[in-house]
Amino acid sequence: MRTYQQALQRACEQGGPVLRGTADMYVGMSEVHRERDDLPAATRQLLRSQELGEHTGLPQNRYRWRVAMARIREAEGDLGGALDLLNEAERLYVGDFFPNVRPVPALKARLRVARGELGEALGWARERGLSVADDLSYLREFEHITLARVLLARYTAEGTERPLQEATRLLERLLRAAEEGQRTGSVI
């Protein structure tokens, strides 16, 4: 949070018009607040970003804003509203220099699981060609963790052991890969 606050302070010290990228910093602070389970503060930061206007955001800001708001809606229990925002985000996404390590379709699959729409979540995994035997990479780690969640939901729905065993093996492999890659956030 401190990094965002320092960057905002420096941006404001420049004087003149609001610098491009300022709105993105508010979106980032919103995500930190949401992670801390301070949903009112997270919402305020997003509204501040919106008040600044689209011209103060970088090209991906419209996409990131909707993903951030969707995650707030999900935390509030508004799964339908979250899904609508993710659909908007998916339409607005434009690739850039940064890899998309948390793709919207994976976020939507997680929402589908939460809504009890296991068939749709399994369909997502099939469309993406995901398997518990895949070679693991950081770029697809979020998708594989989502696959594990889908398998656990399948186990809960069907009561058969196979999805549980597959999810366990996949999570063990993901843990080893994260530890070897020193990705503490993934390990947690």
Residue ranges and their predicted role:
Residues M1-I188:
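Helix-coil-helix junctions within alpha-helical repeat/solenoid scaffolds
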